[in-house]
Amino acid sequence: MRKTPSHTEKKMVYSIRSLKNGTGSVLIGASLVLLAMATPTISSDESTPTTNEPNNRNTTTLAQPLTDTAAGSGKNESDISSPGNANASLEKTEEKPAASPADPAPQTGQDRSSEPTTSTSPVTTETKAEEPIEDNYFRIHVKKLPEENKDAQGLWTWDDVEKPSENWPNGALSFKDAKKDDYGYYLDVKLKGEQAKKISFLINNTAGKNLTGDKSVEKLVPKMNEAWLDQDYKVFSYEPQPAGTVRVNYYRTDGNYDKKSLWYWGDVKNPSSAQWPDGTDFTATGKYGRYIDIPLNEAAREFGFLLLDESKQGDDVKIRKENYKFTDLKNHSQIFLKDDDESIYTNPYYVHDIRMTGAQHVGTSSIESSFSTLVGAKKEDILKHSNITNHLGNKVTITDVAIDEAGKKVTYSGDFSDTKHPYTVSYNSDQFTTKTSWRLKDETYSYDGKLGADLKEEGKQVDLTLWSPSADKVSVVVYDKNDPDKVVGTVALEKGERGTWKQTLDSTNKLGITDFTGYYYQYQIERQGKTVLALDPYAKSLAAWNSDDSKIDDAHKVAKAAFVDPAKLGPQDLTYGKIHNFKTREDAVIYEAHVRDFTSDPAIAKDLTKPFGTFEAFIEKLDYLKDLGVTHIQLLPVLSYYFVNELKNHERLSDYASSNSNYNWGYDPQNYFSLTGMYSSDPKNPEKRIAEFKNLINEIHKRGMGAILDVVYNHTAKVDLFEDLEPNYYHFMDADGTPRTSFGGGRLGTTHHMTKRLLIDSIKYLVDTYKVDGFRFDMMGDHDAASIEEAYKAARALNPNLIMLGEGWRTYAGDENMPTKAADQDWMKHTDTVAVFSDDIRNNLKSGYPNEGQPAFITGGKRDVNTIFKNLIAQPTNFEADSPGDVIQYIAAHDNLTLFDIIAQSIKKDPSKAENYAEIHRRLRLGNLMVLTAQGTPFIHSGQEYGRTKQFRDPAYKTPVAEDKVPNKSHLLRDKDGNPFDYPYFIHDSYDSSDAVNKFDWTKATDGKAYPENVKSRDYMKGLIALRQSTDAFRLKSLQDIKDRVHLITVPGQNGVEKEDVVIGYQITAPNGDIYAVFVNADEKAREFNLGTAFAHLRNAEVLADENQAGPVGIANPKGLEWTEKGLKLNALTATVLRVSQNGTSHESTAEEKPDSTPSKPEHQNEASHPAHQDPAPEARPDSTKPDAKVADAENKPSQATADSQAEQPAQEAQASSVKEAVRNESVENSSKENIPATPDKQAELPNTGIKNENKLLFAGISLLALLGLGFLLKNKKEN
């Protein structure tokens, strides 16, 4: 059945409609069309219609990364430039619009539109009526809401508000109730009282998206009661001005503005140029006195000015003799001047710049105070206006001060040896009581002895050590092994050296316990009259944890630790792994998997002998990963995490849900030594999880693979987890000594000695106890580089084959005003130990934060060819990598949409349609090929190999639903016509979703009859991994080696390759002399690659990858490519890998093209079953001596095996030169998960890409039609 007109048909219709002159015109038009058909194309098949026109319509809202980033990744923390708003002791004058300026005769060529706002008489600006702000309320103005439907958006508030928002996301203050003025919407928030200083907020929607990132505003003065968000959601204490304008406000206490003016210069459109001193008058009246609006140049940064009183003469005309200079036009659109004050203020409250903002006791001879700014500060002035007293009120002599202008801090020197009591520091009117800094505790209490609970003597004795230097008393509360809620007894610990507390539990403690194994405990800490129950940070196992009980009482707020001896549990033959095909980090192929996801598919329930979702069940499916060929399995966090009920881990989550699920990725850590009970067959048994995890690692090692643990040291689930142990120490700190937070937990301060020690001790324990083979650091850029490097060295001392990688986003916050080198992407040029993920290759190949879902290289978006090439050779453009092993090459991970889903979103094609489903898989295979043939270390997300999706296939969500019903963390996907997909919701961050969303779909991964495309993609990746491991060509070990051995073929500007394009080709010479070439055509039409003379030797190559399969052996009848006179032509959405062996012959046997419908049956294979050792098959290679020799014949006759398979699956392997032709004959999954029969088009009906020789008849026909048409026209003319 015909669906769309062909290119030829379109031309005929155009001819008919254009000529409109009777039958003769029609005939002439037809002859023109036939003439066009006879004209050959040159470098690409232009006659093939493009099926996916560019469409820039954005139909989705991107989630905030947790990366981004992030991205990556986490929430944005935005610092206010000038918090708050206007309401000082100034007269409250309603703003009215300035009167039109009296226009003098314009000067020739002068742009009057860029003149400052002024007038000849005082006027007021006018705004739409705005309700007065009630006492104890704070008004937040929003220029523009992030989304159109204001009723589905709200203001989520916390900190010094009367009632912090609860019940995410619906507990926010709804914009449904917002008022509107000339600026935009506004909401009033009630504060918790006069002491309120900080208001924090964000705008979210009912789907649970944080649309703006976290924002906060500090009240500069008590009467400050409003703030504004601009269009980018930056917070200001004044109403932001339109872009390209700065408003200069001038307030005079005497109210006399007569002849007061401004003379200005710098980055302004029209600097003052009249006769001196005729400046621009202050005539417009606003909230803060008089003002002048000055148009700015593009990208303006600074401008200078003078305040003038034109009633005076000579130099006295200057109100201040010195020039004013403002250098922050990038961040401020209003400035505030007062009388003859020398300061330029960026807030309407005239708060002096140099203000103390906090004080910390940092050492026995030093106190450090933070300041709003120290620009221009003089040592003698700081000394003169500073004062320090001890807790008795006695003045302490300041012997010296050191000013750190960049860090905005002053260090006072003196005798501050009293470490038990705070000091009071004042500067002018600002006064702060010191907080004990972590630096003072490091100097006084840092400890390197043993910590935690050591079970000894067959369980008869426990040695306890806790570090808590500020505690007044510490006891251990022991709970019954069979009932963790039952207290057996309490034993006091004794104060030890350097802030430690110690005790030995045995038969003398009168607890009545002869064997402490399996009993539980918590620490009870008393400090300054307050008592807390805390979890031992060095606990080796825990009681079954249920976060739902955390609000019952303090005993349930954190988990209870267990007394265990891990050395005696699990397989005693566990040792470090001997990983196949792995010597250096460039050899690794990392596969990321979630323990529960991997076996939660009900389809394999009957095959499992162990409970699904557990370490034990994971073992039963390990052979799949061995068969795939990966070297390392990276497990999402397996250490104890907070928000989960482990007691219900056995319950299946079969219904579709993306919130309120008993499921977690594990990025909310509770402990860094104990495993979670979620993946244990018995969470109530604290020993079993240890034994079972050891067994999993052992089985991974037996199969020649390694295990990498995903660890989350950058933040905790709750700040109190460590603040209760020792306040103001374990976390990075603000300048005033309060802990910094992230995602609701604390940012662990790894520059602090005991925190760094916790991280390194944890890493060493996990390596030594579980024999793991690597670590992936979540948000590694949050850490200092020194700590990560030290952890790496400690781990490698135990396991020399261990590898480390992490998210190197530039997110380091650290301690305020204490910068240090971060463990981020910028660190890569200084280290060859730890690798980072490359967001550059991810974003360029398939899109990512902040433009996820936009077309990229494999989804139809042209990209800079040189940028793509640099990424493929492990030289990303956004950071410097001095070694290929520094770079983790990836296009999918657990965050955001899966690769399959992001492709569907980007190309706007509904996968429920067979041809779309096939096209998505073709693009997916392109991406996988590019990652697995790239230099560096490839990384695969579980299911990426078969096209995993997280589509929300609940029948109630088959079509779009009301906004308040939209699934949490979902994108609604539409096609390019704006029509929603069938089941249009796709979950992008599924950390709170059910098994129905998250499961690894084993049927898709392995059943080739039911899901031929999925299994083809899976087998394609398996072949790519085998190909990668068969040669050093894709695993070069140095940057110099890459420069010498890898060369770009598709040079932009040559042979039809554009600067930005969707094709790439390059050559690699392996260390053994073999030559490999990779060509990728991500275009929607066939493309030809000109080899020229420099790469003519590639005509002798064997094909290792085509559009259907890949591997280390040559393909007998490769599909999707053909040799041409100029070089190589690839079909649309096709890639290939070629090899020219050193001796000019094939390495191994040539593989026959196999039918797509052959089901994949992964088995536990030994080396003998590796494809490289298959029996030789007849080699069929193109004759490269003939210019028109084809690798894939244009007629594309199927092999016998293919022909045999077409009884079940018609029209297999049709060669295509356009996207539609490439995918029209595939069998794919429809919305009911049933197999859709292939489109019954015959291969013979596909258009020919070559030029036939029957053109003589065609030209004869053209001539006849033209003569007939001319006859009709002459007859018509004669009749008229």
Swiss-Prot record:
It is found in: Secreted, Cell wall; Cell surface. Its main location: secreted. Residues 1149-1196 have a biased composition (Basic and acidic residues). The keyword Transmembrane helix does not apply. This protein may have potential in the disruption of glycogen adherence of the pneumococci to the host cell or disruption of glycogen breakdown in the host cells by the bacteria and thus could be useful in treating streptococcal lung infections. Virulence factor. Involved in the degradation of glycogen of the mammalian host cells. Hydrolyzes the alpha-1,6-branchpoints of glycogen. Hydrolyzes pullulan. Does not hydrolyze dextran. Binds to mouse lung alveolar type II cells that are rich in glycogen stores. GO terms for molecular function: amylopectin binding; calcium ion binding; glycogen binding; limit dextrinase activity; polysaccharide binding; pullulan binding; pullulanase activity. PANTHER family: GLYCOGEN DEBRANCHING ENZYME (PTHR43002). Inhibited by 4-O-alpha-D-glucopyranosylmoranoline (G1M). The active site is at 778 (nucleophile), 807 (proton donor). The N-terminal tandem family 41 carbohydrate-binding modules (CBM) are involved in carbohydrate binding. The C-terminal glycosyl hydrolase 13 (GH13) domain is involved in catalysis. CDD domains: AmyAc_Pullulanase_LD-like, CBM41_pullulanase, E_set_Pullulanase. Keywords: Calcium, Cell wall, Glycosidase, Hydrolase, Metal-binding, Peptidoglycan-anchor, Secreted, Signal, Virulence. Residues 48-61, 115-126, 1205-1218 have a biased composition (Low complexity). Residues 1-44 form the signal peptide. GO terms for biological process: alpha-glucan biosynthetic process. The modification Pentaglycyl murein peptidoglycan amidated threonine is found at residue 1249. It comes from Streptococcus pneumoniae serotype 4 (strain ATCC BAA-334 / TIGR4). Ca(2+) 2 binds at residues 828, 831-832, 882, 886. It is a peptidoglycan-anchor. Residues 42-132, 1140-1248 are annotated as: Disordered. Residues 79-90 have a biased composition (Polar residues). Belongs to the glycosyl hydrolase 13 family. This is Pullulanase A. The record marks 895 as: Transition state stabilizer. GO terms for cellular component: cell surface; extracellular region. It comes from the Bacteria.
